[in-house]
Amino acid sequence: MSATSVDTQRTKGQDNKVQNGSLHQKDTVHDNDFEPYLTGQSNQSNSYPSMSDPYLSSYYPPSIGFPYSLNEAPWSTAGDPPIPYLTTYGQLSNGDHHFMHDAVFGQPGGLGNNIYQHRFNFFPENPAFSAWGTSGSQGQQTQSSAYGSSYTYPPSSLGGTVVDGQPGFHSDTLSKAPGMNSLEQGMVGLKIGDVSSSAVKTVGSVVSSVALTGVLSGNGGTNVNMPVSKPTSWAAIASKPAKPQPKMKTKSGPVMGGGLPPPPIKHNMDIGTWDNKGPVPKAPVPQQAPSPQAAPQPQQVAQPLPAQPPALAQPQYQSPQQPPQTRWVAPRNRNAAFGQSGGAGSDSNSPGNVQPNSAPSVESHPVLEKLKAAHSYNPKEFEWNLKSGRVFIIKSYSEDDIHRSIKYSIWCSTEHGNKRLDSAFRCMSSKGPVYLLFSVNGSGHFCGVAEMKSPVDYGTSAGVWSQDKWKGKFDVQWIFVKDVPNNQLRHIRLENNDNKPVTNSRDTQEVPLEKAKQVLKIISSYKHTTSIFDDFAHYEKRQEEEEVVRKERQSRNKQ
């Protein structure tokens, strides 16, 4: 009985031998008997993906069921280690979805447990596997940290070299590529400094290295220690004082204040705007004031003061750059005049020193002497409390025309302005005066008051103005010739001009009688320090130059 069963079993076992069969032979073999073999083989090689191409159809779930388990384990067990380019996707059952990103980001064994990276990175795909060693089970390395072995690469891609301080892979137990820790430490330890020795490139050539503490060598596990100069940190560099910059050469001449800017450039224009008042200074020596001031005030500047103080005063006044510059006057006079911001008669500090400047200027030019002798300018007593009369604002384009109006006792406005003034003069007749409050555009002050003495003669052209476009003329008599800053009159507002200040008026803007009384009172009582008389000689010279140019133009036109 027993012998027969043994022979029967031996005969059946010999007939059913298979190469990879089970250890215990049975009479019948079922499909379920192979599952332990497949499952065991799957567990051993679970981390070895056979995905050489990341774009295979494994992304899509299988549409039919399979009698065997689906996984990525290699079918061959010939003994060669698999080449895991991608991580495993885990056990795939029928109907489950398989996504590529599961292998690329964050899965156990994804990019971290595998020695070689997949083709998404730039490292080569065919490294020499002999350089990795054979210790440890392939694909079953433990991950030391979440980021410990990311971005690793085989040493063969470096030409068979290792990084300073990194032994061979056969002793690496942290599942990291050779030289990873040393490379990270080398990047952290980058310093600024010169390295006296040189680093050896993988091809054997010698190049000088700067700011490297660990370098690559040609030996598999040798270390190259580079003597580095004394380390210098960024903080030490930032703490060093900046190198002193060479000082720019200053112009020769009187010493000015520390950071005073140069005086503004004055452009020479024949029309005589506010930017071109006063003697034209020479370009090479803009700082020397005696030469420009010699024309309007030759004796005034030379006698009381030396030659250099005017040059000192000019930058001191121009450095604050007060809003619109007035006509060109002596800088000390202008500073004294517009430095006062109080009410009328508040120039307690300036009259004793500066106010007499207008008197000595009488000797500057004979024409001015005749005018002062024929007219009593700036009377001490003036009837400003008018019972009847009309007052108008006159805006001039240049102070040259103011000079000629005082010289010839005439004036001319625009065509519209002439009609308005002529109508007012004829309307008042002998009932009251018609006063004109003169101001130059952009000057920042009123320069005087004149009374209209005749109706407008539309058919006559004076031919003395800085521009030839004005037609008609009428006689005027100048009463006040003084510079009154706008801040003395800005509080007076005109109800017939949108309640704007009187200083913000157009040409031939009429001032209501009650407001006109206030303006006349302030102008008459204001103790001025400057006036156009200070530069009268300068405007005389400009007029002579214009006459020469006009005659030359006329002679060319005749030819």
UniProtKB/Swiss-Prot annotation:
Entry-annotated residues carrying Phosphoserine? 182
What the entry says about post-translational processing? Ubiquitinated by the CUL7-FBXW8 E3 ligase complex leading to degradation. Deubiquitinated and stabilized by USP5 by removing 'Lys-11'-linked polyubiquitination.
Which InterPro entries does its entry note? YTH_domain, YTH_prot
Q: Which residues bind RNA?
A: 395-397, 401, 411-412, 441, 465, 470
Locate the region Disordered. 1-50, 238-363
Q: Name one GO biological process term.
A: positive regulation of translation
The membrane-spanning stretches of this chain are: none
Record note on what altering residue 397 to A does: Strongly reduced binding to N6-methyladenosine (m6A)-containing RNAs
In this chain, composition skew of type Basic and acidic residues spans 24-33
- Start-end of Low complexity biased regions: 296-320
Q: Which segments constitute the YTH domain?
A: 389-523
Q: What is the effect of changing residue 506 to A?
A: Reduced binding to N6-methyladenosine (m6A)-containing RNAs
Which keywords annotate this record? Answer: Acetylation, Cytoplasm, Immunity, Phosphoprotein, RNA-binding, Ubl conjugation
List, alphabetically, the Pfam families matched. YTH (PF04146)
Looking up CDD domains in the UniProt record yields: YTH (cd21134)
Which Gene Ontology MF annotations are present?
mRNA binding; N6-methyladenosine-containing RNA reader activity; ribosome binding; RNA binding
Name its cellular compartments: Cytoplasm; Cytoplasm, P-body; Cytoplasm, Stress granule
Q: Any idea what job this protein has? A: Specifically recognizes and binds N6-methyladenosine (m6A)-containing mRNAs, and regulates their stability. M6A is a modification present at internal sites of mRNAs and some non-coding RNAs and plays a role in mRNA stability and processing. Acts as a regulator of mRNA stability by promoting degradation of m6A-containing mRNAs via interaction with the CCR4-NOT complex. The YTHDF paralogs (YTHDF1, YTHDF2 and YTHDF3) shares m6A-containing mRNAs targets and act redundantly to mediate mRNA degradation and cellular differentiation.
- This chain's protein is named YTH domain-containing family protein 1
The species this protein was found in? Homo sapiens
